[in-house]
Amino acid sequence: MSEMRTLGEFIVEKQSDFPHASGDLSSLLSSIRLAAKIVNREINKAGLVDITGAVGTDNVQGEEQQKLDLYANDKFKAALEARDQVCGVASEEEDEAVAFNKELNKNAKYVVLMDPLDGSSNIDVNVSVGTIFSIYRRVSPVGTPPTQEDFLQPGHKQVAAGYVIYGSSTMLVYTTGAGVNGFTYDPSLGTFCLSHENMMIPDEGKIYSINEGNYIRFPTGVKKYIKYCQENEPSDNRPYTSRYIGSLVSDFHRNLLKGGIYLYPSTQSHPQGKLRLLYECNPIAFIMEQAGGIASDGAQRIMDIKPTELHQRVPFFVGSKNMVKKVEEFLELNRD
């Protein structure tokens, strides 16, 4: 049996992969690890304490905030602010980016963007949820307050990205641009242990993930692609299997392991799409590309899009290389 490696050991071991290695990024990832453990503990008590359900307020997107959304947001912010690597965060749950103004954070080199609890509306029915994070080097001068430009960087500028999935087991999956690795939380040890090394997605899959309840509102190209997935064509393993949980992290994680495509296109009610470029699409795209897949808005690479606002939305197609290319073909041939 190979020797078990913890997340902390793995981070230190890989520190030399960074051209500007100083230990800062390693410490930042350790902060995320700590916050994930705290949130995981609370999620596991969600049915026993008064932390499920809505709080009666909406976030900047007009979505009802859940108690655990705010709890996770506070815990991740606190963990990141407590060390000197991060000068500010932008969160799906915050209207504006938050600058850390303590003396401790004055010379910080990084900003973090996050969806602190993706799929939180599923908590009450015990469906897996997750945290998504994205890390950039700031572009404003170190020693000054962070600016909007620090957060509005294209995805190809990310130095690290990852997600935590809180499910039957809790996993942290991340990349720093040198492959994708997954760590499973061992509650008996209180630590994450390397369980999925060098994760790669197959070029072809048999799963397509989309909310087909919105079918009538989809672009023609997406409708035709869904029909393509359902056709009986044994020569290329069709029909595909439809699997949709409604939690981005959960659907993405399954497809990453098994091969498949996740689709969240534009609709008549959301012509720009519904998923957020900065908090969801860019970090997931970075992970997918590092695992050998593709992430697209249907016409261009997700990580080439230059953001114009913090809560910008985009259509999102991510997964096995050949499957994403195929849906792009359908969209190109069937422009509404």
Swiss-Prot record:
- Keyword Hydrolase among record annotations: yes
Q: Where does Mg(2+) 1 bind?
A: 92, 115, 117
A cellular-component GO term for this protein: cytosol
Positions of Mg(2+) 2 binding: 115, 118, 280
Biological process GO terms, please? fructose 1,6-bisphosphate metabolic process; fructose 6-phosphate metabolic process; fructose metabolic process; gluconeogenesis; sucrose biosynthetic process
E.C. number, please?
3.1.3.11
Q: Which InterPro entries does the annotation name?
A: FBPase_C_dom (IPR044015), FBPase_class-1 (IPR000146), FBPase_N (IPR033391), FBPtase (IPR028343), Fructose_bisphosphatase_AS (IPR020548)
In what pathway does it function? Carbohydrate biosynthesis; gluconeogenesis
Q: Which Pfam families match?
A: FBPase, FBPase_C
What is the designated name of this protein? Answer: Fructose-1,6-bisphosphatase class 1
Q: Which organism encodes this protein?
A: Vibrio atlanticus (strain LGP32) (Vibrio splendidus (strain Mel32))
Q: What is the lineage of its organism?
A: Bacteria, Pseudomonadati, Pseudomonadota, Gammaproteobacteria, Vibrionales
